[in-house]
Curated annotation (Swiss-Prot):
This is Transcription factor tau subunit sfc4. It comes from Schizosaccharomyces pombe (strain 972 / ATCC 24843). Transmembrane segments: none annotated. Phosphorylated. TPR repeats lie at residues 133-166, 205-238, 277-310, 396-429, 431-464, 466-499, 841-874, 924-957. TFIIIC mediates tRNA and 5S RNA gene activation by binding to intragenic promoter elements. Upstream of the transcription start site, TFIIIC assembles the initiation complex TFIIIB-TFIIIC-tDNA, which is sufficient for RNA polymerase III recruitment and function. Part of the tauA domain of TFIIIC that binds boxA DNA promoter sites of tRNA and similar genes. Sfc4 is the TFIIIB assembling subunit of TFIIIC. Component of the TFIIIC complex including sfc1, sfc3, sfc4, sfc6 and sfc7. The subunits are organized in two globular domains, tauA and tauB, connected by a proteolysis-sensitive and flexible linker. Interacts with sfc1, sfc3 and sfc6. The gene is sfc4. Pfam families: TPR_8. One of its GO terms (molecular function) is DNA binding. Keywords: Coiled coil, DNA-binding, Nucleus, Phosphoprotein, Repeat, TPR repeat, Transcription, Transcription regulation. Residues 506-554 form a coiled coil. One of its GO terms (cellular component) is cytosol. Residues 66-80 have a biased composition (Acidic residues). It is found in: Nucleus.
Length: 1006
């Protein structure tokens, strides 16, 4: 049977013409009618005991291909009608027609029989001839009572030959074929007959559903989808049946690639069952495949909130179980919602472990709750149950995702604790998780660690594939292990000798190893290979339009070979004249590209075709920078050469594959020319200040502008690479201003991209270059002052060590004695160093802030005290010292708590005295901080007085008669909103709802 084609058996019978019914019956025929009626009456009384004649249908029942309703033809509507009409004589029919005609003559509207106001009678609803009715009754008797399926089948075939619109005959014919066994041929013939019956009665949704299940069993997927569509369009009155049909159709579509249609079906079901986990699972799997997690995240969030309100996971079907939670976590992982993912895994798995009430774990910034080492779970309010391993067992899939989330937020030590558990699992079980970890390390460019996990995966032979070898080759290439990288790419080419990506990487490896002839040959072969492919495609589809793939992809193979006018130079001549001509062309081409950049820059300023102009600008700039970086003379030292090689192996995503190949072939041509006839005259370039008739300043501006534009389009890591490479170029390194501005540009890029981890490198350079200058410490605090991620970068362990070494250097210089672990004093460009003449309170205070952020209150108090001793009249020092004492007093293991609170308020009131005389804004700030301090230790009745004083100075109190504009602070620095909110919380906790409502109405509702 052909899956999607026509049905020859059905078509041949459909084309049969219906025989004319006999007009007159003689007495013998009337006797036969009576005999057949008796047979039908007996058949109707057949009990369920006679089911043995129907054969063994258990196998079909298990497959969902048999139901009692389908086989109970003696009680069907069609047969019932035929049985009733079989006992009616022609005279009765004629009398009824005569009466109807009389009514019509008398002016009454003629009754339409059996249609209840509907249109014309369909072929299937027309009564068959009496001859057909008699044959059908006899076939029923043979099938049901005698179990003579062969004779019943012959009669059914004869009925179909006489009148192919009899549904019951088609159904019986299909049933006869099915009773012959579960063989494929029998089921196919059964399906043919039932499909014909279903088309005769398109509203029979149950029959369409049966045909769909049979089609699925025969792997006729398109036909099964068609039958499900017809069952749904039949609009069954029972909503549960409609949902069943849509569910089966959606599952079928999902399993066979029609993901969009499957998603539409599941979304329809989700409207009536928003918390059904089975529907959510299927939708999650679909959107994970098409990389569109955001389409379903909202529905998962709604369902999660609904189930999470229970103290423990409910029991039943279609509930939010651990696999559903894992899919929810996978969606958050794909959408890069790292903080939400961490929170979901911690709370979700805790809920499934029966520990929902242990919310105190959320107070910790790490994942000690799931540590294999039980000692990290020990803390002051821990109970004996915290040593129960099963209650604190984190499933491996969740541990992998949690580790990746920690890795992406810059918490490398915490991530490694999770990965160490996965790393010790057998590779045949954990290779999928190991691969995800390795890819995560590649994303943050820790290729050494990524390679470590890729090597582990190689121990499991079934996991080895082209993707694994390619990623390993990229890691080896970035780590400058060219021999291993070449082996990986050659392994790919053994399996797939036309793999473009492996060939390109192999060419890059040869280029970096100065084997330019081999690299040029590989690139030329790629051009030839792609030209042959394109010519073959043009021959096969001359009239088809081919989509142009703009932008680079990981594996691209559909782009046309560029018709570059210098493509002919793939095998350049070695003559001096041609080398000179090539150099002239490169110079002219470079100037042309710079001119094109100027034109595009003007277009960007006018905001004309911004997207197209920007992509073109980035592509041209990328080619120019590649051209600059390919000059080895510009990167003499080994460190600078590594930066150059690193940029050469990273191609911007704005350059297409064709552009990459063209750029590479031009570089190789240029390099081969210089190799044979001498490299560029670096002294001449430095003396004249021009390279390819373009000033060094213009090249410098290109690097800076390119990095800034990359940052604006979201490629901040590539911007860092470009700037790092520029820092290694000798043309820029000799100029102090250019060298410093490149660092400032990197800091600007990190600030624009809100990348605090990226800002740490230029900030440490600022500390080193401008030692013992207070503005550097203020800049550090200002850059890392926004949000949670900045806060984590602020307390980075490397920063702590760096600042501690600076403090030790300051102590060493001030005491004239050697201090172990001190930093090195850096000299300025004039050869002199900045030596402090006194202790710097800002540096000590900054380190105290880092200790306080880590909740290390005793070290924080020590450094705050040093800052206080240096400058006792600094308000921020007094405030910080007072708060540190209060926080230390509130810790569980604190000794002499009341004395520490007294010390804390001593410094806080000193801060108040220093601040209150500086102005109304400063006074309001001091009042608010005192109120917050009392609120923090639980003395709320004292806090109320200070909060009310803050509100008295707020511009929001202008309605009061006692308040004038001269006695209020500026709205820019007003603390009234914060004070009102805290005051409202106090009133609510104390049960004074009336006052809380008054505060909200006056200060919090706008």
């Amino acid at each position: 049977m052909i899956q999607n084609g026509g049905n020859s058996y059905v078509d041949s019978n459909m084309n049969e013409t219906q025989n004319d019914t006999t007009d007159n019956f003689d007495a013998e025929m009337q006797d036969l009618n009576g005999y057949i009626s008796e047979i039908v009456d007996e058949a109707r009384n057949v009990s369920e005991v006679d089911a043995k004649f129907l054969g063994d249908t258990s196998a079909l029942q298990a497959e969902g291909l048999w139901s009692d309703e389908e086989s109970d033809y003696e009680g069907s509507d069609d047969e019932s009608n035929f049985s009733k009409t079989a006992s009616r004589t022609e005279d009765d029919i004629a009398n009824e027609e005569w009466e109807e005609n009389l009514k019509a003559v008398a002016g009454f509207r003629k009754v339409r029989k059996g249609h209840k106001g509907r249109g014309r009678v369909s072929r299937a609803d027309m009564l068959p001839s009496v001859e057909v009715q008699q044959m059908l009754s006899l076939a029923n008797h043979l099938f049901a009572q005698e179990g003579n399926f062969d004779e019943a089948q012959k009669l059914a075939e004869e009925i179909v030959r006489i009148d192919n619109n009899v549904i019951a005959a088609w159904k019986m014919l299909g049933e006869c074929h099915r009773q012959r066994g579960n063989g494929r041929v029998n089921i196919e013939k059964c399906l043919i007959a039932w499909m014909a019956a279903a088309h005769l009665k398109p509203k029979d949704h149950e029959l369409w559903f049966t045909c769909a299940k049979l089609s699925e069993s025969l792997e006729f997927w398109d036909q099964a989808d068609y039958c499900y569509n017809r069952a749904v369009s039949a609009k069954p009155p029972n909503k549960s049946e409609l949902k069943k049909y849509i569910w089966n159709r959606s599952v079928l579509n999902k399993e066979h690639g029609s993901l969009k249609k499957a998603a539409e079906g599941f979304k329809f079901l989700l409207q009536s069952s928003p918390y059904n986990a089975s529907i959510l699972k299927n939708l999650a799997e679909i959107y994970i495949k098409i990389h569109a997690p955001r389409e379903i995240l909202k529905q998962f969030e709604i369902a999660w909130k609904y189930f999470y309100q229970y103290p423990a996971p409910p029991i039943g079907n279609d509930i939010f179980d651990l696999p559903t939670l894992n899919l929810y976590a996978e969606l958050l992982l794909l959408d890069h919602q790292w903080s939400n993912l961490i929170r979901l895994i911690n709370r979700g798995v805790r809920w499934f472990r029966g520990r929902k009430s242990e919310s105190f774990w959320d107070e910790f910034d790490d994942d000690r709750e799931w540590d294999v080492d039980e000692r990290r779970r020990e803390f002051p309010n821990a109970s004996e149950e915290h040593t129960n391993k099963e209650a604190y067992l984190l499933p491996h899939l969740f541990r992998t995702k949690l580790g990746i989330a920690r890795l992406k937020t810059g918490e490398l030590p915490e991530a490694e604790l999770h990965f160490s558990v996965i790393k010790n699992l057998p590779p045949d079980y954990a290779w999928g998780m190991l691969y995800d970890i390795a890819k995560a390390y590649m994303d943050i460019e820790r290729l050494d660690l990524a390679l470590e996990y890729f090597v582990l995966i190689c121990n499991h032979e079934p996991a080895q594939n082209i993707g694994l070898w390619y990623n390993m080759g990229v890691c080896y290439l970035e780590l400058k292990e060219y021999e291993h990288a070449q082996q990986c790419m050659e392994a790919i080419l053994i399996v797939d000798n036309s793999n473009t990506n492996a060939l390109i990487k192999l060419a890059e490896i040869n280029e970096l190893q100065d084997n330019r002839d081999a690299a040029l040959e590989i690139v030329t072969n790629i051009f030839e290979q792609r030209r042959n492919i394109n010519e073959l495609e043009r021959e096969q589809s001359q009239n088809e339009d081919h989509e142009k793939n703009v932008g680079s992809q990981l594996f691209v193979g559909n782009q046309k070979v560029p018709q570059d006018k210098w493509e002919k130079r793939a095998r350049i001549s070695r003559s001096k004249e041609e080398a000179r001509q090539f150099t002239i062309w490169k110079t002219e081409e470079t100037q042309r590209r710079f001119h094109k950049l100027d034109i595009l820059r003007q277009s960007l300023k006018k905001e004309e075709n911004v997207s197209e102009s920007l992509n073109e600008w980035l592509a041209i700039a990328s080619e120019l920078i590649d051209e600059f970086v390919s000059i080895k003379a510009f990167f003499p030292s080994e460190k600078k050469a590594r930066a150059r090689a690193g940029l050469l192996t990273r191609r911007t995503r704005y350059a297409s594959l064709n552009d990459q190949l063209t750029s590479m072939i031009n570089r190789l041509n240029d390099s081969l020319t210089r190799t044979k006839y001498g490299d560029l005259d670096l002294d001449t370039i430095l003396r004249t200040g021009y390279f390819r008739n373009v000033s060094i300043d213009a090249w410098y501006q290109l690097f800076v502008e390119f990095s800034l534009r990359l940052t604006k389009v979201g490629s901040v890591q590539q911007a860092y690479d470009v700037l790092t490479t520029a820092m290694g170029a000798i043309l820029f390194d000799q100029d102090t201003i250019k060298r410093q501005n490149l660092r400032w540009c990197m800091l600007a890029c990190s600030m624009y991209a809100r990348d605090p981890q990226g800002a740490l490198t230029p900030l440490r350079w600022v500390f080193t270059t401008f030692q013992f200058r207070q503005d550097t410490y203020r800049l550090f605090s200002a850059v890392l002052s926004q949000g949670y991620e900045c806060s984590r970068a602020f307390v980075d362990s490397a920063n702590q060590k760096f600042l501690l070494r600076l403090i030790k250097l300051m102590d060493q210089l001030m005491s004239n004695s050697l201090v172990s672990g001190a930093a090195t004093l850096v000299k300025n460009d004039d050869g002199l160093a900045t030596v402090p003449t006194s202790y710097d309170p800002v540096l000590v205070l900054l380190y105290g802030h880092i200790m306080a952020r880590n909740r290390s209150w005793i070290p924080a108090i020590n450094y705050y005290s040093r800052a206080f001793a240096i400058n006792p009249d600094c308000p921020i020092t007094n405030l910080s010292l007072g708060l540190a004492y209060l926080h230390r007093a509130m810790q569980r293991l604190s000794d002499n708590r009341h004395y520490q609170i007294l010390q804390g308020f001593t410094f806080l009131y000193r801060y108040y005295d220093l601040r209150v005389n500086e102005g109304l804004g400063e006074k309001q700030e001091a009042l608010y901080n005192l109120g917050k301090a009392y609120h923090f230790i639980g003395l709320e009745h004292y806090a109320v007085k200070y909060y009310e004083a803050v509100l008295g100075l707020s511009p929001m109190s202008q309605g009061d008669k006692m308040t004038s504009s001269e006695s209020t602070v500026s709205t820019t620095y007003d603390f009234g909103f914060e004070a009102a909110y805290n005051l409202r919380l106090i009133y609510i906790c104390s049960g004074n709802i009336k006052l809380a409502f008054q505060i909200s109405s006056k200060y919090l509702i706008f």
